[in-house]
Swiss-Prot record:
PANTHER family in the record: 3-DEHYDROQUINATE DEHYDRATASE (PTHR43699:SF1)
Assembly, per entry: Homodimer.
Keyword tags: Amino-acid biosynthesis, Aromatic amino acid biosynthesis, Lyase, Schiff base
Biological process terms in GO annotation: 3,4-dihydroxybenzoate biosynthetic process; amino acid biosynthetic process; aromatic amino acid family biosynthetic process; chorismate biosynthetic process
Protein name from the UniProt record: 3-dehydroquinate dehydratase
Protein's organism: Methanobrevibacter smithii (strain ATCC 35061 / DSM 861 / OCM 144 / PS)
NCBIfam families: aroD
GO molecular function, one term: 3-dehydroquinate dehydratase activity
């Protein structure tokens, strides 16, 4: 048996040459996908972004994270979306936040790229019915739903497992050390993607890729 869950490593670097260097390191460590955090670049312009994507030549999630959800992009919303639209033909996935205008999400989805519609809350975990509402809305707008919440107790992390067990094509994460196990459990529910750390931790509770691969392989061996 094998897991169909891909391991993605976010690349959060300010300089073009560092993005490429870290990407090569993460590929060598066994990443299945790289999340290119475009918003981390010092001066993101499409010529540099295109060069990076072509140089890496590996499955990529293009993310240009909005500041209200932990991102660093400093331009206008129109500039942020324009970069994602230009990236769409060059990458495997585009991540766009649910709070973005629906017309922008539709424009990206209409390019044909696999569209991840995401929602992050770094302060709390809502009630299960609210999470379900968010996921269902994301699924209507895109191809893959993504939610990530900060747990305040163990019960909050169990809500994430419930979402994973009931919702297809969904990435669901409970952040912090308390919720880190949900990143491993994602493979149990055939979540399309889980996130691990390469050189740097870019979100609370990320597990380094070596440990993640070891845990996933251990789990799969027990199931054989």
């Amino acid at each position: 048996m094998y897991s169909q869950t891909k391991i993605a490593i976010p690349i959060f670097q300010a300089k073009k040459e560092d993005v490429i260097k870290v990407a090569e390191d993460c590929i060598e460590k066994g990443a299945d996908v790289l999340e290119f955090r475009i918003d981390a670049l010092d001066n993101p312009n499409f010529d540099d972004i295109k060069e990076i994507i072509e140089e890496i030549n590996f499955p990529i999630i293009a993310t240009n994270r909005i500041s209200s959800e932990g991102g660093s992009f400093k331009g206008s919303e129109e500039e942020r979306i324009d970069i994602l639209l230009k990236c769409a033909p060059l990458v495997d996935y585009v991540d766009i936040e649910l709070q973005s205008d629906d017309r922008y999400i539709k424009q990206i989805h209409d390019t044909g790229v696999t569209t991840i519609v995401s929602y992050h809350d770094f302060h709390k975990t809502p009630e299960i019915n609210e999470i379900m509402y968010i996921v269902e809305k994301e699924q209507k707008l895109g191809d893959i739903a993504k939610v990530a919440f900060m747990p305040n107790d163990l019960d909050d992390t169990l809500k994430i497992l419930a979402i994973l067990s009931h919702c297809e094509n969904t990435i669901a994460i409970s952040m912090s050390d308390l919720g880190s196990y949900t990143r491993v459990m994602a493979s149990k529910f055939d979540s399309p993607i889980t996130f691990a750390a390469g050189r740097d931790v870019t979100a609370p509770g990320q597990i380094d890729i070596e440990t993640m691969k070891s845990l996933l392989n251990m789990d799969l061996n027990l199931m054989e």
